[in-house]
Swiss-Prot record:
It comes from the Viruses. The lineage of its organism: Viruses, Varidnaviria, Bamfordvirae, Nucleocytoviricota, Pokkesviricetes. Residues 302-468 form the Helicase C-terminal domain. InterPro entries: Helicase/UvrB_N, Helicase_ATP-bd, Helicase_C-like, P-loop_NTPase. This is Transcript termination protein A18.
Length: 478
């Protein structure tokens, strides 16, 4: 259980530094999730993960006693490359120090996309030799964990049919590893069971959760805190450090050649009745999250045609072979899918549709294919999609925050046989009402990809055409 006490000025200041001015929410002594105000006389549950960092004064010693040992006999360590071994060495040293100083054994593994967080975490799982729960945000991530866990030869159970079905299964069967989706944590009985019977908890893609929200995960970490806990992410949320405050971060030295191709094209103005109607909402509250910006971009036929022509040409010339095309809206996704199917047929073109339950099977099939175009949304494929062989990313949408951009670019930053990785951007639009918005968001992608992720911007691609100016100059020279 987390520590329940009054939040004095020092502790309040420590907690607030993770929130960038946002309000602080915690569970009070009555287990209600409320805002914490300065000088409050109420008692609040303070997540024990906060004290995993030695810079935070330890209010009460945490005596970690792990009794749930793994039962498998012939356990093996997965193979790691040197930098992964370096991370393991840092983590194990830190965990021993936490144990000896009576601090909670909590750590965030802040490692770049493509580093191999999954296999590194499985190695640590074998080091601890304690029963483990692996929690993922969605079913799509389960397969990559299954593959990694099998390398250890630990027994495991995968739960995809709901927590009730899993609880029935656990009455007659046990396993060293449970792989679950985070929805399972809404069941209090299940939370108590894994707290009592499993010692290690691995939270994959921890940035997907805002732990300042009153969620099942927030409750679990507060009232059923694991004895050993790892958060895995390439783009950590600062506020989540309140629940897991110690971070290991190792920069990856990569042999990949990462290219950023910006395809510029100056279009003649284009509009339709549909576009004009939607443009009326651009400067209203309805466009707070730029939904109309993306809807209008979906209708930009000249830009869409340029994207299809560019990708088709590169794919035919085999300068790109395993391509993911990312959009924001489903209508945009089906447009590109239909166009690419006309060009190359269904043997090469696949749809990453979140509404289709067979999409995970499609993703698995792509692991063995030499050439394909995979069209999907940023919601489905922006985080956790595990197709290491991808060599190209085509970004068709505009509105992405910094975390989404880094996660999206990470889809093509994984080590594979192909060391040449290419990202395509299309910063121009034929629709004048969204010209500046598209340019602004494209600049953000360029900045993160070059300054933070090591992409090199290549010479500007495409054809620049300004028909009105061309006609004017032509008439002057006659």
């Amino acid at each position: 259980m987390s520590v329940c006490l009054e939040v004095d000025y020092t502790l309040y200041t420590e907690l607030k530094k993770f929130l960038n001015g946002q309000p602080l929410f915690l569970f009070n002594a009555d287990k209600n999730y409320v805002e914490v105000v300065p000088s409050s006389t109420l008692k609040f549950y303070i997540p024990i993960g906060l004290f995993s960092n030695s810079n935070v004064a330890l209010i009460r010693p945490v005596h970690t006693t792990c009794t749930n040992h793994i039962e498998s006999v012939d356990v093996t360590f997965p193979n790691l490359y040197p930098l992964q071994k370096h991370v393991v060495a840092e983590v194990t040293t830190s965990m021993r120090q936490k144990l000896s100083t009576h601090r909670p054994m909590y750590m965030t593994l802040h490692l770049s996309c493509g580093f191999g967080k999954t296999v590194t975490a499985c190695y640590l799982m074998v080091v601890h030799r304690r029963k483990t729960v692996i929690c993922v945000p969605n079913k799509m991530l389960i397969h990559q964990w299954k593959v990694a866990v099998e390398l250890t030869k630990l027994s495991y159970i995968i739960s995809t049919d709901g927590v009730s079905m899993l609880l029935k299964q656990l009455r007659t069967k046990t396993a060293d590893v449970l792989i679950i989706v985070s929805r399972h944590l809404s069941n209090d009985y299940f939370c108590k069971k894994i707290h009592d019977e499993y010692d290690t908890f691995i939270l994959d893609e921890s940035h997907m959760y805002n732990l300042m929200n009153n969620s099942a995960l927030t409750k679990f970490l507060t009232f059923y805190p694991p004895r050993i806990c790892y958060f895995l992410t390439a783009t950590p949320r600062l506020m989540n450090r309140i629940y897991c405050n110690d971070v290991v971060n190792v920069l990856k030295v990569s042999a990949l050649t990462k290219r950023l191709k910006i395809v510029e094209y100056f279009f003649e103005p284009y509009s339709t009745d549909c576009i004009r109607q939607m443009a009326k909402h651009l400067n209203t509250e309805n466009n707070k999250y730029h939904i109309y910006t993306e809807k209008i971009l979906t209708e930009d036929l000249p830009r869409n045609n340029l994207i299809v022509e560019t990708v088709s040409r590169e794919f035919r010339n085999e300068t790109i072979e395993r391509v993911i095309v990312i959009v924001k809206l489903r209508k945009h996704m089906t447009f590109f899918y239909d166009r690419f199917v006309k060009e190359f047929g269904t043997d090469y073109v696949y749809l990453g549709d979140a509404k289709n339950k067979d999409t995970s099977t499609v993703v698995k099939s792509l692991l063995q294919k030499k050439k394909f175009i995979f069209v999907s949304t940023s919601h489905y494929s922006g985080t956790g999609l595990d197709i290491p062989s991808l060599d190209s990313l085509v970004i068709c949408c505009a509105v992405l925050n910094s975390m989404q951009i880094e996660q999206l670019l990470g889809r093509v930053c994984r080590e594979s046989e192909s060391v040449k990785k290419t990202v395509f951007l299309f910063p121009n639009t034929s629709i004048r009402e969204i010209k500046h918005s598209l340019g602004f968001f494209t600049e953000r992608i360029v900045s993160i990809s070059t300054d933070k992720l090591g992409f090199e911007q290549e010479g500007i691609e495409g054809t620049k055409e300004e028909p009105v100016l061309t006609k004017a100059f032509s008439s002057q020279t006659r």
